[in-house]
């Protein structure tokens, strides 16, 4: 009986215990069913998080183009390598040692380091900096190893195919680790970041526990939004001429700074802008984070005399044949001297302009115009305010006008400071019939999806500081600065073209007080426009503290840039030279007919008979395309490119000028990039190789003396060169 009692009691206890447990579980079940909440977490949401997968649809940052649609900055594919370690995933790393042994050399890492990463207790790992920014080529090499668990995350990086080309204008963009998006940090990339930036889209769908999409699962798609494309006013050809010339001067004279701007005076469009030192936005080896063309105010020197002269002519107080005593001029306790210290005796004011006499301009400001009226013209030319060019970091100069001596010295560019872009803006009034144009670098912004232009820049007249008649008279006077035997601008004569302009030799303030002394311690400059009869280009060049010998003047490095860039640019724009009769035979302008459809042999012979160099591209028998195009003018012995039918084949460009390489790239729709200056001695595409549009063409250039040996080894020529003797 006792045994039965204990048995019944145990059964009762068990019954009660399991009944309570059942009711607790049932209550919990009812609660979960009713509320859907467990431990503060909404179960439906947690389930959705676990089985709802999200895939990013990558958008593309806007592309930056030059005025003709040549790419200057673009997004290109790059990849981050990752390893899946989760054994529950169908594809995961199964042999860390073997994977590390094969992968390490391609990532330029130690085998032990890779193996350590692959043995981490994590579901997925990456390989640090060596595993990011991987190119398509390297990705393919890794994929060929067929390593289980090794995968790639597609990304993009900003690429600048031309390296240092207009780098302070374009700037650069890079990924911000905090926001995981590319952000503009300098130049156009920064100024137009809102327009250029992209917005990634995404796809959401339900998956099984292994991550595979469930059959018939709905997709939620948010489409990506690509950034807008920005078209600059920069002309790739003119910018290339400028970069090439500046590289040569930098190498030869090792100056502290070089600043140059080329603009269209009719519109204010900036066609080229560059500074030295420069940087490659792909590497970001930046010494100076400011664009000196817009952010470096300094005493301009005698280029400022252009605007003092314009004010005097406009007010009718400049009498070119009136004489004055040059040499020195007293202003209170201060004595102003001409640059040669003694002057040239009694000379006319016209000769004073030609010789860049400080005394002439001191007298114009103080005795002809008057300081108050001169200040009004400084404001009319907007030297008291920034230009508003669409680049970050623009600064304005400082008009020093407190004391009598400052008012007078401002007239010849000393004391008062201005920026190069302010001088360019003011000079448009001289070259554009009195109308001063606002400088700008962005021509238009285009939506890549619709192709619609969302912003178009219209040329803006910011002021009319002088009359059209005054502008013409000033141009006439400035032309004599270049043509007169007494003119300081004689080094800036360009054969076949009339140039008007003014030289500048600006003193550099000494931090200890006063100004630096010495033959080299100046900012040498020239502000010129051509052709005189209808200026199409204005150009400012400044070279600070070049390493010139005592037999050289500051005009040597400045004219080396101005003359070559101005002449090449005028020819490129098909602006006909004013050819003197004695030069007709030497520089005959040739209007090219169309050779398309003709036999290669016939076209080649015709061009060679005109003294032109000819390069044949391809092995066909008929001409399919030519460059320059029909109707364009060239001068013998310029190069003409003839593309034949059939595949386009890369010629040997050894010894070519950068200008000819750019012609080739335009004809074949290649993406050119260059290193160095001078003439080509190395190319990345093998001569004879078939090329396709958008292939990258990289050339290295050097001086002729450096490529002579390489030229001697080239025994096979794939081009037919003229002229015929």
What name fits each language-model region?
Residues 1-282, 372-382, 494, 544, ...:
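Periplasmic/cell-envelope proteins involved in peptidoglycan metabolism and beta-lactam response
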Residues 57-60, 67, 76-78, 147, ...:
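Extracytoplasmic
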Residues 73, 209-213, 217-218, 260-300, ...:
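Beta-lactam-recognizing serine transpeptidase/beta-lactamase-like catalytic domain environment
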Residues 104-108, 147, 174, 197, ...:
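Sec-exported extracytoplasmic/periplasmic mature domains
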Residues 131-145, 151-163, 167-168, 172, ...:
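Conserved SxxK-family serine transpeptidase/carboxypeptidase catalytic domain
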């Amino acid at each position: 009986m006792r045994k039965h009692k204990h048995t019944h009691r145990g059964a009762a206890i068990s019954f009660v215990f399991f009944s309570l447990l059942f009711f607790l579980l049932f209550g919990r079940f009812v609660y979960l069913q009713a509320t859907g909440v467990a431990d503060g977490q909404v179960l439906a949401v947690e389930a959705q998080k676990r089985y709802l997968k999200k895939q990013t649809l990558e958008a593309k940052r806007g592309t930056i183009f030059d005025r003709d649609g040549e790419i200057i900055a673009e997004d290109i594919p790059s990849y981050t390598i990752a390893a899946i370690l989760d054994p529950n995933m169908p594809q995961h790393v199964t042999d860390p040692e073997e994977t590390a042994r094969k992968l390490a050399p391609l990532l330029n890492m130690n085998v032990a380091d890779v193996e350590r990463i692959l043995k981490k207790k994590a579901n997925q790992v990456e390989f640090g900096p060596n595993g990011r920014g991987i190119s398509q080529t390297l990705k393919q090499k890794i994929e060929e190893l067929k390593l289980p668990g090794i995968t790639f995350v597609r990304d993009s990086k900003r690429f600048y195919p031309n390296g240092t080309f207009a780098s302070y204008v374009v700037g650069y963009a890079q990924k911000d680790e905090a926001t995981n998006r590319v952000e503009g940090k300098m130049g156009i990339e920064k100024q137009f970041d809102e327009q250029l930036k992209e917005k990634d889209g995404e796809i959401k769908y339900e998956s099984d526990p292994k991550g595979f999409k469930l059959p018939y699962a709905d997709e939620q798609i948010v489409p990506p939004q690509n950034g807008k494309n920005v078209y600059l006013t920069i002309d790739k050809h003119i910018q290339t001429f400028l970069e090439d010339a500046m590289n040569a001067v930098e190498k030869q004279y090792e100056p502290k700074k070089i600043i140059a701007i080329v603009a269209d005076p009719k519109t204010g469009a900036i066609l080229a802008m560059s500074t030295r030192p420069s940087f490659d936005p792909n590497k970001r080896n930046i010494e100076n984070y400011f664009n000196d063309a817009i952010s470096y105010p300094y005493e301009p020197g005698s280029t400022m005399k252009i605007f003092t002269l314009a004010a005097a002519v406009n007010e009718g107080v400049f009498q070119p044949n009136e004489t004055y005593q040059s040499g020195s001029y007293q202003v209170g306790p201060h004595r102003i001297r001409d640059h040669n210290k003694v002057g040239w005796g009694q000379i006319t004011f016209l000769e004073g302009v030609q010789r860049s006499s400080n005394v002439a301009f001191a007298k114009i400001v103080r005795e002809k115009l008057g300081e108050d009226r001169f200040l009004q013209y400084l404001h009319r030319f907007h030297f008291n305010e920034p230009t508003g060019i669409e680049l970050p970091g623009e600064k304005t100069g400082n008009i020093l006008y407190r004391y009598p001596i400052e008012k007078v010295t401002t007239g010849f560019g000393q004391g008062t400071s201005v920026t190069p872009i302010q001088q360019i803006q003011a000079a448009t009034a001289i070259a554009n019939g009195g109308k001063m144009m606002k400088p700008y670098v962005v021509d238009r912004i285009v939506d890549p999806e619709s192709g619609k232009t969302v912003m178009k820049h219209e040329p803006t007249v910011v002021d009319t500081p002088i009359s059209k008649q005054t502008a013409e008279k000033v141009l006439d006077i400035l032309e004599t600065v270049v043509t007169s035997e007494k003119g300081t601008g004689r080094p800036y004569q360009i054969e076949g073209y009339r140039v008007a302009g003014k030289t500048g030799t600006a003193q550099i303030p000494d931090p200890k007080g006063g100004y630096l002394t010495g033959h080299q311690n100046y900012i040498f400059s020239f502000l010129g426009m051509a052709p005189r009869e209808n200026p199409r280009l204005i150009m400012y060049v400044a070279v600070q503290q070049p390493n010139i010998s005592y037999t050289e003047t500051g005009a040597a490095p400045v004219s080396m840039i101005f003359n070559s860039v101005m002449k090449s640019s005028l020819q490129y724009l098909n602006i006909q030279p004013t050819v003197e009769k004695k030069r007709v035979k030497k520089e005959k302008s040739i209007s090219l007919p169309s050779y398309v459809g003709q036999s290669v042999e016939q076209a080649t012979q015709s061009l060679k008979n005109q003294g032109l160099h000819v390069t044949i591209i391809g092995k066909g028998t008929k001409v399919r395309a030519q460059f320059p195009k029909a109707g364009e003018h060239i001068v013998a012995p310029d190069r003409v490119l003839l593309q034949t039918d059939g595949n386009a084949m890369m010629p040997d460009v050894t010894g070519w000028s950068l200008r000819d390489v750019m012609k080739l790239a335009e004809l074949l729709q290649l993406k050119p990039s260059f290193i160095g200056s001078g003439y080509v001695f190395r190319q990345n595409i093998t001569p004879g190789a078939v090329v396709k549009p958008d292939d990258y063409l990289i050339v290295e250039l050097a001086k002729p003396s450096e490529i002579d040996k390489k030229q001697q080894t080239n025994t096979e020529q794939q081009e037919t060169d003229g002229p015929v003797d």
